[in-house]
Every structure is written in structure tokens, then in C-alpha cells.
Regions:
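Conserved helix-to-beta-strand junction in the class I
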Residues: 164-168
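S-adenosyl-L-methionine-dependent methyltransferase catalytic module, highlighting the catalytic core
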Residues: 145, 153-161, 171-292
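Conserved N-terminal segment of class I S-adenosyl-L-methionine
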Residues: 1-146, 155-159, 229, 254-265, ...
Length: 297
């Protein structure tokens, strides 16, 4: 992706970072519609081990459990998954009886892993699809935005548009990488890692940590009901034997450690595992953070 001017990181007034200038809409559409899932970019892979699939299903289950604790989610409630990817979260709520809709640039991921959801899937530009939803007057009880906000050129506009399609008691669930975190600062300051590995243009265009995300959401009229972490895989970087940034060959085994650890702990008690990750989320520790939000009354 070529630009006349090299993109640079700019800190916003809310504390999160964005690239400037941004890639064009055409470049991004081509990237996501034709390259992202098919070539295994980001966290996506053309194939997964059975234990990895169990891990993805577990993460979706944890999101459902927490959402049901915070909101009276009934069968038949309307859910929209904006940027539904391979469909793991969408499928979890579908199995619970919700009326689901999914949007994404590409159908490749959902077609491969959850083809039964294609009936509820709409492919194209997510901003255009949200506008169509608004023009149809549809309001949702649950809105999922999982690992999407970091990819879009206008995250602020996206949050404004989402708010318009939320019902009065709706729940917005945002999953985002926890970047420029306190842990990342220490890893860089102590030279434990040689580079800011989380920077990945044009895949991620904005970078949030707990504080900056809460600043942004609060400023646009959202109440943050809970912040929940996922596995803090970055803590492995403190150990030279599992420093997958210095030695990328250690990455696969470290990832599988995360997968097996979470699957094992969930088998013992999934509710207690959720409690662990709620504690870490409150501390701002975790590779991803999940924000459960409602509209301020």
C-alpha cells in the first residue's frame, strides 16, 4: 500500500493513537475483501486445530455469559455483529436464540467456519450497511464490535452511528487490542522487546488502551458497565524462554500455551475464569479488552 506521504502516529485528545494520513477507502476495501481472511492476516488463519476452535468458542461463550449478567437478554432479541469475521460470537448468540445479523467486508471467514449463518450475513462497507439499517428504522438489543474499531478510518463516527441503532436498553460490546498499555511501556523502557510489535499498518489504524477507550466512550455518551480482559499473553515476554518478539519461532508454542491454559481453566469453572479476567480487565492487563457499554440515561 503506497502513499505519497508516509503515515505517522498521532495522539488524539482522548489518548488513543491514529495513523495520519489514512489509506483510501478503495485500498482498505481491497485489503479486507480479498486479502485479509484468505491469506491468514491478523489473528485469522485458513485452518485451525480443534483446541483452537474450542478456544474461540470459549471466548465467545465468556462474552455471552458476561452480557447476560449485565442485560436481560431474551430469545428473539435483535443482535447485530458489525465486522463479524469468522462468526464465532455471532454463532454463540444465535445458539442462544437471538435474532442475529452480521456485517463484514468479506464473507470468506463466515462461509468457511459458520456457513449456516450466511442467511443472516450482509457483505459490504460496514458504514453503508449501518446507514441502511438506520434508514430501515431497525434498533438492536445487542451490538457486537469485536476487533473492528482498530481497523476503521473513523472510529469516532462509527461509535456515533452505532448509538443511533441501539434500543433504549441495548448493550454495546467492544473488543479491542490493548495497545500502548502499561505493560507495553515497561517492555519498551526496559528493552525487553526491540520494537513496538503491536503497530501493524494498514491492518490497525487506531490503538487503544483501557484509559483511552474509556475516555472516548464516555465522551460520546456511553456508560462502561464492565471491562474484561482475555488471556494476557504479553506477560510471556518477561520470560526470555517465551519472548516471541525477540524470537518469533517461540510464537506458535506461546499461542498454544494460551489456548490450552484457557481451555483447561474453563473446564474447571468457566464463571471463575470470567472473574479472573474481570479482575485483569479492571487492571488494564490483557492482550484484548472487552468493554460492555450502555447508553447513558
Amino acid at each position: 500500500m503506497k502513499h505519497a506521504q508516509k503515515p505517522r502516529l498521532v495522539k488524539t485528545k482522548w489518548g488513543f493513537y491514529q495513523y495520519d494520513p489514512m489509506p483510501s477507502d478503495e485500498e482498505l476495501y481491497d485489503y479486507y475483501a480479498h486479502k485479509y481472511y484468505q491469506t491468514g492476516q491478523g489473528s485469522y488463519s485458513p485452518e485451525y486445530l480443534n483446541e483452537e476452535i474450542a478456544y474461540f468458542q470459549l471466548k465467545a461463550n465468556l462474552i455471552y455469559i458476561k452480557a447476560s449478567q449485565l442485560s436481560n437478554i431474551q430469545p428473539g432479541a435483535k443482535l447485530i455483529d458489525i465486522g463479524c469475521g469468522e462468526g464465532w460470537i455471532m454463532d454463540e448468540f444465535y445458539k442462544r436464540g437471538l435474532s442475529v445479523s452480521g456485517l463484514d467486508f468479506s464473507k470468506h471467514g463466515i462461509e468457511k467456519f459458520h456457513p449456516h449463518l450466511l442467511t443472516f450475513f450482509d457483505q459490504g462497507n460496514i458504514f453503508e450497511k449501518i446507514q441502511k439499517t438506520l434508514s430501515d428504522g431497525i434498533l438492536f438489543d445487542v451490538v457486537i464490535l469485536a476487533n473492528v474499531i482498530e481497523h476503521v478510518k473513523e472510529p469516532v463516527l462509527l461509535l456515533e452511528e452505532i448509538k443511533k441503532c441501539m434500543g433504549p436498553c441495548a448493550l454495546l460490546i467492544i473488543v479491542a487490542p490493548n495497545d500502548f498499555s502499561a505493560l507495553h511501556q515497561i517492555l519498551i523502557e526496559k528493552k525487553i522487546i526491540p520494537r513496538k510489535f503491536w503497530l501493524c499498518y494498514p491492518d490497525h489504524l487506531s490503538y487503544f488502551n483501557r484509559n483511552s477507550m474509556i475516555n472516548l466512550l464516555s465522551d460520546f455518551g456511553y456508560s462502561i458497565l464492565a471491562t474484561v480482559a482475555d488471556n494476557p499473553i504479553d506477560l510471556n515476554l518477561f520470560n526470555e524462554n517465551s519472548n516471541y518478539i525477540k524470537d518469533p519461532s517461540k510464537g506458535k508454542n506461546t499461542h498454544l500455551f494460551r489456548v490450552r491454559m484457557d481451555n483447561f481453566l474453563a473446564d474447571i469453572n468457566i464463571e471463575k475464569l470470567l472473574t479472573i479476567y474481570e479482575t485483569l480487565g479492571a487492571m488494564g492487563v490483557g492482550r484484548n479488552l472487552t468493554y460492555y457499554c450502555s447508553i447513558e440515561k
